[in-house]
Amino acid sequence: MNAMNAEGRTFKGVLYFGLIVTEQGPKVIEYNCRLGDPEAQVCLSLLETDLLEIMNAVIDGTLENVEFSNREGGAIVVMMCSGGYPEAYAKGKEITGLKEDGQNDSFHYIFHSGTAFKDGKYVSNGGRVLGFVCLGDDVKDAQDKVYANIDKVAFENSFYRHDIGGKR
């Protein structure tokens, strides 16, 4: 940011920092000029304020005039990945448990990150395939909902973490 300012360039946008907590404290592992994925999926699921209004205010320099509003409660996103990810993984595995619109009524949202629609079926097409979002009265409630239902959707060699939102 200092280098951009020194060149007379103004940054207006989103800065995303990927962090990890280590024994030595938090460390930055990446940063981007975009929303993080799947982090944005869970955060935006709670946002009630129009995102376009927010981004226009960022561009116009009037963000202090935007009244932010979020849903009450908590949210959680759990990613379903292809076996082998983040290394080599197979593509084209049929995904079961999705409706024609790519959703499942057990979840508030299912975000397609690495899917394709071939021959009338959803198939895996990446490492991080689906992001399952549930909302709840609090994070624990959302966590209970997502883990109670995530096995309703599956594909060969799929896996997901069991510790999102705290140890289970």
State where each predicted segment sits.
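Generic long, charged, amphipathic alpha-helical segments
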Residues: 90-131
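Active-site "cap" helix and flanking loop/linker of ATP-utilizing ligase/carboxylase catalytic domains
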Residues: 1-16, 32-105
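Short coil/turn motifs at beta-sheet boundaries
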Residues: 12, 24, 71, 123-125
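Short beta-strand elements
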Residues: 17-21, 26-35, 114
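Generic C-terminus detector
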Residues: 115-119, 123-168
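General structural feature for long, well-ordered alpha-helical segments within catalytic domains
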Residues: 15-16, 27, 43, 47-51, ...
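Generic structural motif
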Residues: 22-24, 36-38, 81-85, 137, ...
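Residues in well-ordered beta-strands of folded domains
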Residues: 18-20, 79, 96, 111-114, ...
